């Protein structure tokens, strides 16, 4: 039987941890990729390593990037405050072209591994309004992936899988719990402290808390 491999973007948060569990349940050998890109804290990278170990991935890779050299986001520029109240439009926590960059590197690793599937935990229901989380973006990237790679041109097509795309945060939590995700290992907060404790005020914290509440499941998040 041929091994079914997948590269999965793993941030260390709730959504990406759920995606790893979903891919594993579908019989994939999971290769996870995280990025040290100049974000506000390293707690999410520590969380990603914990999740990768707990879910038994084949290999977990951390890639260094200097997106803080570009700036333009509250997540990569410490002079921009993380908003603690809902606002209009695309928030300042949007990191310019982040998912495009991350998926491009995942695509490269997938080609090396001869993996045909790349998973990403984007969501367009309970989300912050980022343009690179929409179905149109995922579909467009998949088309590009199959035009821009040796494997794609030779007919070994790639699939960009976004299984959470149309799920509510409550549904995501329920799906993860059903597949054995330990959410106490994850960190979602935009401004978590070094110990991984959350602020409870940012948009990501609100979405996470609302998801657990709507799912009727106890939230294991620790706050500072």
From Swiss-Prot:
Keywords, alphabetical: ATP-binding, Ligase, Metal-binding, Nucleotide-binding, Queuosine biosynthesis, Zinc
Enzymatic class: ligase
Pathway: Purine metabolism; 7-cyano-7-deazaguanine biosynthesis
Keyword Metal-binding found: yes
Catalyzed reaction equations: 7-carboxy-7-deazaguanine + NH4(+) + ATP = 7-cyano-7-deazaguanine + ADP + phosphate + H2O + H(+)
Binding site for ATP: 10-20
EC number(s) from the headed UniProt entry: 6.3.4.20
Pfam families (UniProt xref): QueC (PF06508)
GO molecular function: ATP binding; ligase activity, forming carbon-nitrogen bonds; zinc ion binding
Gene Ontology BP, a term: queuosine biosynthetic process
Record-linked CDD domains: QueC-like
SUPFAM superfamilies attached to this UniProt entry: Adenine nucleotide alpha hydrolases-like (SSF52402)
Cofactor: Zn(2+)
Note describing how the cofactor binds: Binds 1 zinc ion per subunit.
Domain of life: Bacteria
Binding residues for Zn(2+): 189, 199, 202, 205
Described function: Catalyzes the ATP-dependent conversion of 7-carboxy-7-deazaguanine (CDG) to 7-cyano-7-deazaguanine (preQ(0)).
Similarity section: Belongs to the QueC family.
NCBIfam families on file: 7-cyano-7-deazaguanine synthase QueC
PANTHER family (UniProt xref): 7-CYANO-7-DEAZAGUANINE SYNTHASE (PTHR42914:SF1)
Protein name (database record): 7-cyano-7-deazaguanine synthase
Organism whose genome encodes this protein: Pseudomonas putida (strain ATCC 700007 / DSM 6899 / JCM 31910 / BCRC 17059 / LMG 24140 / F1)
